[in-house]
From Swiss-Prot:
One of its GO terms (biological process) is cellular respiration. This is Periplasmic nitrate reductase. It comes from the Bacteria. PROSITE patterns: 4FE4S_MOW_BIS_MGD (PS51669), MOLYBDOPTERIN_PROK_1 (PS00551), TAT (PS51318). Pfam families: Molybdop_Fe4S4 (PF04879), Molybdopterin (PF00384), Molydop_binding (PF01568), TAT_signal (PF10518). The lineage of its organism: Bacteria, Pseudomonadati, Pseudomonadota, Gammaproteobacteria, Pasteurellales.
Length: 828
């Protein structure tokens, strides 16, 4: 399809008006007459984890247009407001185009001015700092904080560079802040990660329950599908649970506002209701589940010196699960009566009972969706377990229109962070560094000698901040994220370590973000279709795209940076002498040679039959790097329930949902007739465990790490708005998006405002025990908060909401709780 740039701008005007109003519309409703000026190709959207496919229009070496891909199953030609403005994210006036090092008089100076340097100069000082830190502080002396926005190829390269080449597992993604609890609970419940269902469930479900998920703004294309299902089928029901009222409530038949943290009590009440009313599937439970009891009083992931950690009894065994049975489970949930759930949550009894009846109805196909409200939670793993319990008790799982569905917030939090394994403890395809057999397999598939990959887990995201501050770690490379703005407790735990004289911080980014400006070295990065890439979305769908334009100036893709940087190290410098003595063929080689010129990664050449094909990495390195990385990686999962198709298939398709066996994708896992790994006659097989049974886990309600008191008398919860994505690095550089929502706000109940002598629009100071932020008050807008709670966002670099947040984490998953801390608000 072809569309002129002028006509595209007309299209955008109509689209913007509709999207700001909360609509998602297909391009065919607004497009003008076609011509042959613009070249079109497909790519997945750069933003959330939905995985919409867009058609990208290029002209004269620039991206000038985009539109929803009508051939894509996910979005069916629709885009949300952010998707329609994708071309503009790449052309901000302050785009970085050369490496920048802090220097004074031609030498590195921690307090110097950012000065352009060559890539060789940048990598030389980086290598020097890495070698020194790893030698002096051990494998965790240097590390990387990376992203669920990195491509699959970039994830493979960084995992190999750190875990194999540098022999450091000290690499963790920002997905630790958003998806770790979901991933851990998947692994603990089913023995395998990621959802069993897919987006096709939406058109087959009779009821939807949203737990801590504002899909109307955060996953608007999926919300459009739910809206269509609800509005075209009168009997379909929607329940929305949250700590405040947001736009998703507009469609809700049952809108539930609960006290922060009390979702744990509500879910235990539902489980108790199901048992008391014999609304459970006894046959399913007997055949396909087993019972465990979780450890309790496990702390809050704070520093060991914190009073809450010292008081907790089971911090060291937080993840332990004890054998149990149905009778003990029944006894443990019995205290969660309607009265107790109401008392803890503040939810009216009739609403609680109505919700329980939705799950109890055997005729109702039901899907539970959740996002950060569940995961960014000091008991996030428990919350995920508790929703699985409900679906397992009723047998409403792993079949069309029925199941628990964890939605991801980033385009490849699944495909890269989880599947590739860029967490500090993971390897590809659900393998972990602490399992010697898994390590042995990784060494074999990566053609490495035994003993190269270490079994010591690296620092998780929050621990990296603490280690840098405490000087246990001296080098940090941040890639494809903005943690100085997006991570918790900036004042006390992050900024001090970044600016410490002994530490060296590198940031790879296309723009001068808050993180970049706090770093010592900035590396300019290619964006989106300036490189060839691949993402994996929330429904296990892997999608590829080709490079379509070149990056500006000296900007390089992250995969180029990682692979080129590997040339600055030798095995003699980084690997143990005994390993090299036993394997002399590796001695004296660069990490580039052993990791990326190993006869596997470098065995493919770029296609010669594709007119206009470009691949800057292949041109530089002399081989088809992306294909080599992917095919080497894909071997990890083939035959083990993580099967991926071959490389070329993905470039032809609009994505495929794994496992892909004999060329066929899998829509519903663990169910006979849909999943090729479930044998005939098994019906359901949760084959992540040898006994093929899923775990139902008994865990209680426990209070949050911090709650309001006389001084800090309000709950604070943080999140996003429709128009902006995460820290606004891209969306705030789109003029239309910036104008539609220029600055952050603090939403407050009108009575709370009146009590403080405040009015809508007032300039206010919001303070916590950790810091403060100046903003403006909103008592009338889209978010309607209950008394006692305020809501704010983190997209605005001029208002750093994470000055306020607490760095408490789930003790099992190590995921941060951005949803609950105590603040006070006063006139500024």
């Amino acid at each position: 399809m072809n569309l002129s740039r002028r006509d595209f701008m007309k299209t955008n005007a109509a689209v913007a008006a509709a999207a700001v109003a909360g609509l998602a519309i297909p391009v065919k409703n607004v497009e003008a007459s076609p011509d042959k000026i613009i070249k079109w190709d497909k790519a997945p959207c750069r933003f959330c984890g939905t995985g919409c496919s867009v058609l990208v229009g290029t002209q004269n070496g620039r991206v000038v247009a985009s539109q929803g891909d009508p051939d894509a199953d996910v979005n069916r030609g629709l885009n949300c407001i952010k998707g329609y403005f994708l071309p503009k994210i790449m052309y901000g006036k302050d785009r970085l185009t050369s490496p920048m090092l802090r220097m004074t008089n031609g030498k590195f100076d921690k307090h110097g001015e950012f000065t352009p340097v060559s890539w060789d100069q940048a990598f030389t000082i980086m290598a020097e700092k890495f070698k020194k830190a790893l030698k002096e502080k051990g494998p965790n002396g240097a590390g990387m904080f990376t992203s669920g926005q990195s491509t699959i190829f970039e994830g493979i390269a960084k995992s190999k560079l750190f875990k194999a080449g540098l022999r450091s597992n000290n690499i963790d993604p920002n997905a630790r802040h958003c998806m770790a609890s979901a991933a851990v609970a998947f692994m603990r419940t089913f023995g395998m990660d990621e959802p069993m269902g897919c987006y096709d469930d939406i058109e087959k479900a009779d009821a939807f329950v949203l737990w801590g998920s504002n899909m109307a703004e955060m996953h608007p294309i999926l919300w459009s599908r739910i809206s269509d299902r609800r509005l075209s089928h009168p009997d379909v029901k929607v329940a929305v649970l949250s700590t405040f009222e947001h736009r998703s409530f507009e469609l809700a038949d049952l809108g539930v506002i609960f006290t922060p943290q009390s979702d744990l009590a509500i879910m235990n009440y539902i489980a108790n209701y199901l048992i008391q009313h014999d609304a459970i599937d006894h046959d399913f439970i007997q055949k396909h589940t087993k019972f465990k009891r979780g450890e309790t009083d496990i702390g809050y992931g704070l520093r060991e010196t914190h009073e809450l950690e010292k008081a907790a009894k089971n911090v060291k065994t937080a993840g332990k699960m004890h054998d149990s049975d149905f009778e003990e489970y029944k006894k443990l949930v019995a205290p969660y009566t309607l009265e107790k759930a109401h008392e803890i949550s503040g939810v009216p009894k009739e609403q609680l009972e109505a919700l329980a009846k939705m799950y109890a109805d055997p005729k109702l196909n039901i899907v539970s969706f959740w996002t950060m409200g569940f995961n960014q939670h000091t008991r996030g793993v428990w919350a995920n377990h508790l929703i699985y319990n409900i679906h397992l008790l009723t047998g409403k799982i792993s079949k069309p229109g029925c199941g628990p569905f964890s939605l991801t917030g980033q385009p490849s939090a699944c495909g890269t962070a989880r599947e590739v394994g860029t967490f500090a403890h993971r390897l590809p395809a659900d393998l972990v560094v602490t399992n010697p057999k898994h390590v042995e397999k990784a060494e074999k598939l990566w053609k490495l000698p035994k003993g190269v990959i270490q079994t010591q887990v690296g620092y998780h995201a929050v621990a990296q901040d603490r280690a840098l501050k405490d000087k246990k770690m001296n080098v940090l490379w941040q890639m494809c994220t903005n943690n100085m703005q997006g991570g918790p407790n900036i004042n006390q735990e992050r900024f001090p370590g970044w600016r410490d004289e002994e530490n060296f911080v590198i940031v790879s980014d296309p723009y001068p973000t808050v993180s970049a400006l706090a770093a010592d070295l900035i590396l300019p990065t290619a964006m989106w279709v300036e490189k060839e890439g691949a993402y994996g979305n929330a429904e296990r769908r892997t999608q590829f795209w080709y490079q379509q334009v070149k990056a500006p100036g000296e900007s390089k893709s992250d995969v180029w940076q990682l692979v080129e940087f590997s040339k600055y190290f030798t095995t003699d410098e980084m690997w143990p002498a005994e390993v090299l003595a036993a394997n002399p063929e590796y001695k004296g080689k660069t990490l580039y040679e052993v990791l990326f010129r190993n006869g596997q990664v470098d065995k493919f050449q770029v296609p010669t039959d594709k007119p206009g094909y470009m691949n800057d990495e292949a041109e530089h390195f002399g081989f088809y790097l992306q294909k080599g990385l992917f095919e080497e990686y894909a071997v990890f999962g083939r035959g083990h329930g993580h099967d991926l198709a071959d490389f070329e298939t993905y470039h032809k398709a609009r994505g495929l949902r794994w496992p892909v066996v004999d060329g066929k994708e899998t829509l519903w896992r663990y169910r006979e007739g849909y999943d090729p790994y479930v044998k005939e006659g098994e019906g359901v097989a949760f084959y992540g465990y040898p006994d093929k049974k899923a775990i139902i886990l008994a865990v209680p309600y426990e209070p949050p790490a911090e709650a309001p008191n006389a001084e800090y008398d309000l709950w604070l919860t943080t999140g996003r708005v429709l128009e902006h994505w995460h820290t606004g690095t891209m969306t705030r550089r789109v003029p239309e998006l910036h104008r539609s929502f220029p600055n952050n706000l603090v939403w407050m109940h009108p009575l709370d405002a009146k009590k403080r002598g405040l009015r809508h629009g007032d300039k206010v100071k919001i303070s916590s025990r950790r810091g403060e932020m100046i903003s403006h008050l909103d008592t009338r807008g889209r978010n309607k908060v209950p008394q006692g709670l305020v809501y704010t966002t983190f997209f605005d670099a001029g208002q750093l909401a994470n000055y306020l947040t607490l760095d408490a984490t789930d003790p099992i998953s190590k995921e941060t709780d951005f949803k609950k801390c105590a603040v006070k608000v006063e006139k500024a």
